[in-house]
Amino acid sequence: MFGPFKPAPHIAELPAEKIDSTYKRLRWQVFAGIFFGYAAYYFVRANFDLAQPGLIQAGLYSKAELGVIGSAAGLAYGLSKFVMAGMSDRSNPRVFLPFGLLLSGLCMTLMGLFPWATSGIAIMWVMIFLNGWFQGMGWPPCGRTMVHWWSKSERGTIVSIWNTAHNIGGMVPGAMVLLASAIFFSTHGIEAQAKDVWQQSLYFPGIAAMIFAIPVYFVMRDTPQSCGLPSIEKWRNDYPDDYNEKTYENDLTAKEIFVTYVLKNKLLWYIAIANVFVYLIRYGVLKWSPVYLSEVKHFNIKGTAWAYTIYELAAVPGTLLCGWVSDKVFKGKRGLTGFIFMILTTAAVVAYWMNPATPEAELANYSAWYENPYQLTDFVLMTLIGFLIYGPVMLIGLHALELAPKKAAGTAAGFTGLFGYLGGTVSASAVIGWAAQHYGWDGGFYVMIGGGVLAVLLLLIVMVEEGKHKAKLGDTYGTK
């Protein structure tokens, strides 16, 4: 890379008496940077989904049209995450991470404040594509940072904690819609409908994301060696089974990264394909629940915003539990943990689909969703799905990081993301939108449930192959 994006050079090691204290302080500091930085990316990752009911209600776009527009996000993000991962592996995350955040926030701010940016399908598709491309600059530098600052035996826990950042950030758009609704009520004296606040759901999070980019730059650092510290493996005396100082600590060529450590890695291919169907459910529920709950389950804008928010909130304890289980109970067996969580996730999606809508004759009996037993059940099931689905999402990214040397970790994770977003997110938007438009919401749920079953089968294969892989290397997880 060049200019400010160039990796920070290694410097002379600090005196021995300063290493421990400096390492501990900088790990907290760097973690704050990647946690709050990545959380801010999620201010503007899926906030467009909350604008969709308003765009439909205002008669501006149909579900099928929004599905086409929304597909740009997955297409762009999948390509970008892979391309940017290769660039990130040879860049300074201190610059790379906040720069992408700034550009992504700018895209959403333009869409919310300037009518030309939402004036037609083509221009909206381009704007969503650009936002998705800049979003691809978020995960790779964070993954690169974690493999340099935390060793293998602690990585499952630290990645699961960090992974909750996107759930924390994902709650912000819903909260901002509630804020916009409150402002509308205070100025107009009537309850806001979806068509009244869709612009705010775009530019409120966009402005917030741009503001967050500034402190992220100041707290981030590149590698430990660029701060005068030894490698994390040396400091913790915790080496992977296949550790080789040349490949782990020295920069690799683009060909070595892509061909040797990605394309020839069979286990990485398995988890990449599984990621397609994990992401299909993750984004199928997230993207279409605001419309589904509004059209079918009779939720108002406040109920929809609360359900969207709790879906992300529930992911925090679910992801932490999944990371802890994979580390402490299953001793690093990511495939087994993901297999169990995806079985439970698919069952929860079936229950969400089967729960009946409130009979229209009874709607007047309930003043809020939490007083309505039908809607309360939907709310609980949304919570359960959010609790379960983000564990496999986290595990696949973590597994990819562990299947390649540190200098190729971002590309390995980008490879799985490429499949997840090109296959899973595009399908969650375009295919589910098309199915719901032409076959009703049952058609949309057939797609999601079928994806859940395929994810379970693929993670079963991963589980079996993972066992063979560990047996071949000698399972010394967490013993060094």
Swiss-Prot record:
Keywords: Cell inner membrane, Cell membrane, Glycerol metabolism, Membrane, Transmembrane, Transmembrane helix, Transport
Subcellular location: Cell inner membrane
Gene3D superfamilies: MFS general substrate transporter like domains
Topology Periplasmic: residue spans: 58-64, 114-121, 182-201, 296-300, 355-359, 438-442
Annotated GO MF terms: glucose 6-phosphate:phosphate antiporter activity; glycerol-3-phosphate transmembrane transporter activity
Topological relation to the membrane, as annotated: Multi-pass membrane protein
Residues spanning the signal sequence: none
GO cellular component, one term: plasma membrane
An example Gene Ontology biological process: glycerol metabolic process
InterPro entries given in the database record: G3P_transporter, MFS, MFS_dom, MFS_trans_sf, OPA_Antiporter, Sugar-P_transporter_CS, Sugar_P_transporter
Keyword Kinase part of the UniProt annotation: no
Listed Pfam families: MFS_1
Assigned protein family: Belongs to the major facilitator superfamily. Organophosphate:Pi antiporter (OPA) (TC 2.A.1.4) family.
Name this polypeptide is given: Glycerol-3-phosphate transporter
